[in-house]
Regions:
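Gly/Thr-rich phosphate-binding loop signature of adenosyl cofactor/nucleotide-binding cores
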Residues: 1-82
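Feature captures the catalytic cores and cofactor-binding loops of soluble hydro-lyases/lyases
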Residues: 46-57, 61-136
């Protein structure tokens, strides 16, 4: 039996997510897992258990880590991350998206969205919503 899915556009509307960069096929992107990921370990180079199907949530900790890297190293790590083509990247706390980050979203066709909500609150609400929508019936 096929699993359930939620259109990314539904989540954008439900959570009033700002679209920083989105591909032309935005209406075709579906989320099929309630699992979320904060990519701090990926920015440090660890990909062993990385699942690009998960919604990626970038908050203050991830931005803080990246800002501590040299520009060259930061670009290298973020390019590697986007090359894995995560389903969608959502930043929290209304964090400023650099032109570099936006360009990598476009380069790898990865939607980049933003919310003004705090990371924990947003993740909790999103997890509940996805768990209900994707639950076995």
């Amino acid at each position: 039996m096929a699993g359930y899915s939620v259109k990314l556009t539904k989540l954008i509307k439900e959570y009033h997510l700002e679209q920083i960069w989105v591909p032309e096929n935005l209406d075709e992107i579906v989320i099929e897992t309630a699992e979320l990921n904060r990519p701090g370990l990926q920015f440090a180079g660890f990909y062993k258990y990385f699942d690009p199907e998960r919604i990626q949530i970038i908050g203050k900790s991830e931005f803080g880590y990246l800002s501590g890297l040299s520009r060259e190293k930061r670009l290298e790590m973020v390019d590697l991350y986007f090359s894995k083509q995560p389903k969608v990247v959502i930043t929290t706390w209304n964090l400023t998206i650099t032109k570099e980050l936006g360009a990598l979203g476009e380069k790898y066709s990865v939607p980049i969205l933003r919310t003004s909500e705090g990371t924990s609150e947003f993740m909790a609400a999103l997890t509940v919503s996805l768990s209900v929508a994707l639950a076995k019936r």
